[in-house]
From Swiss-Prot:
Substrate binds at residue 252. HAMAP family: IlvC. It is an enzyme of class 1 (oxidoreductase). The gene is ilvC2. Belongs to the ketol-acid reductoisomerase family. Binds 2 magnesium ions per subunit. This is Ketol-acid reductoisomerase (NADP(+)) 2.
Length: 332
């Protein structure tokens, strides 16, 4: 079972005694920087020259400096720029500013897991990964609550890396909800698998296949959209609140019976075997290498896939139907 840690297990004074640089000011960056500041931590934000986020960070009362300067000043450096550019930012602005005893933090383990970033032996390497988007992390913190976090230590140069990581998690509200101890390898591999096989890749492929099956059989695209995409939110919300049990308790007996007898015909042993192949490609680094090659090669295939899906009948139908739904903008 998972090892859980709460407020009483973490010493906030540890992170309060350090100088923290948050590199990046996107979804997670703003939540980390503002919440750490409000927890009494000495924070600066490191941004590249010309960053559009600079004005926003300064308006919110944070000190913004170039990335290299932030790294030189701080002894805890949290890298929260997008995965594909982390290695470049590290090599250019962070690597030469690290000192023995410093700590390098990440919000996701990809660049450490696959060796794109190789920290020196004298620094702690930790991860604090909230299991929610940045706006939720910040809102929960402000309301006196928190979002559960994953915490990991890849390199414990000082002997105090885990205590430091727990302290950091407490500074952003994570220990109020609960912190789960993991490893960089476990977090990275499960995160990528979940995204590809279930949450993004799996769901979008399932929705498109269902929509295409109905429209190819002569049903109206609008009706197919409602049945295969729109109502997905109702089911996912129920699962989010109470797992499969609450979802099945809430739907009709007809729908529940269809779940039991038809679901296994759609997600078959063949599908699961393909999932195992996907996991193997994540574990052996194939996916990470291919993704980095694609990104640094100009994103040609990525943009082709994106364009194809934007022109799919599912998408064009949805754009028109959502104009009928006044509540959609209100929920966004």
């Amino acid at each position: 079972m998972a090892e859980l840690f709460y407020d009483a297990d973490a010493d906030l004074s540890i992170i309060q005694g350090r100088k923290v640089a948050v590199i990046g000011y996107g979804s997670q960056g703003h939540a980390h920087a503002l919440s750490l500041r409000d927890s009494g931590v000495d924070v600066r934000v490191g941004l590249h020259e010309g960053s559009k986020s600079k004005a926003k960070a300064e308006e919110q009362g944070l000190r913004v400096v170039p990335v290299a300067e932030a790294a030189a000043e701080a002894d805890v450096i949290m890298i929260l720029v997008p995965d594909p550019i982390q290695a470049e930012v590290y090599e250019k602005d962070i690597k030469d500013n690290l000192k023995d005893g410093d700590a390098l933090f990440f919000g996701h383990g990809l660049n450490i897991r696959y060796g794109f970033v190789k920290p020196p032996a004298g620094v702690d390497v930790c991860m604090v990964a909230p299991k929610g988007p940045g706006h939720l992390v910040r809102r929960q913190y402000e309301e006196g609550r928190g979002v559960p976090c994953l915490v990991a230590v890849e390199q414990d140069a000082t002997g105090n890396a885990f205590a430091l990581a727990l302290s950091y998690a407490k500074g952003i509200g994570g220990t109020r909800a609960g912190v789960i101890r993991t490893t960089f390898t476990e977090e990275t591999e499960t995160d990528l698998f979940g995204e590809q096989a279930v949450l993004a890749g799996g769901v979008t492929a399932l929705v498109k296949a269902g929509f295409e099956t109905l429209t190819e059989a002569g049903y109206q695209p609008e009706i197919a959209y409602f049945e295969c995409l729109h109502e997905l939110k109702l089911i996912v919300d129920l699962m989010y609140e109470g797992g499969l049990e609450k979802m099945r308790w809430s739907i009709s007996e007809t729908a529940e019976w269809g779940d039991y007898v038809t679901g296994p015909r759609i997600i078959t042993d063949v599908t699961k075997a393909e999932m195992r192949k996907v996991l193997a490609e994540i574990q052996d680094g194939t996916f990470a290498k291919n993704w980095m090659d694609e990104y640094h090669g100009g994103l040609k295939k990525y943009n082709e896939y994106k364009k194809q899906d934007s022109e799919h009948l599912l998408e064009t139908t949805g754009k028109e139907l959502r104009k009928l739904m006044s509540w959609v903008d209100e929920e966004a």
